[in-house]
């Protein structure tokens, strides 16, 4: 099992939190101190928590479970899409649609519409339509793909969520909590860790930090899939550990 080390996190700037005036007291126990009015995250706390989260994801993947990657803010979206695609995991990189988990039946109908439009675009149906109708369907396809393209192959609810910036993705976390889906989240000094089962205290803005989180998580999924046990599968409810402190 490959693990992240302290040097990786320092190089990526994981330890840089937000300005001290924006801090959330619930993150106090993960803060080492402050420098130039910026909170410094205690990486001695982050390191084992990050590696625990990676181990959890690897166990889930080994049991053929699905981990959904969620990161819709500008600094995260591209990296989330790239790394999720690399490990064959579902992802949301543009905008979280309300009900994506709690109203999955409706979402599934939209995914079917997306697939139908993709088929029409490929089999020449669009070419047989009027220019106006073809344009309308092309726009519909583009819009649906941007919103749902990352989850069109999910085939059901995910077994866990990995979230970059828990404040920004609070709706996703609330939906997962309602359904009992475990949440792994990068939590910065200005955020609330509530509703997060596996907390990773760290910088949720720096691109290098986001790359480290996402690459490590994708690697964990790939390792798990490559080590699928012959007989024993680990299911989400069995692998889920108690909520982090």
From Swiss-Prot:
One GO cellular component, as annotated: cytosolic small ribosomal subunit
Keywords (A to Z) from UniProt: Ribonucleoprotein, Ribosomal protein
Superkingdom to which the source organism belongs = Bacteria
Q: Which GO terms describe its molecular function?
A: structural constituent of ribosome
> What biological process terms from GO does the record include?
translation
What Pfam families is this protein classified in? Ribosomal_S2 (PF00318)
- Give the similarity note: Belongs to the universal ribosomal protein uS2 family.
Q: Which NCBIfam families match?
A: rpsB_bact (TIGR01011)
Q: What is this protein called?
A: Small ribosomal subunit protein uS2
Species assigned in the record: Pseudomonas putida (strain W619)
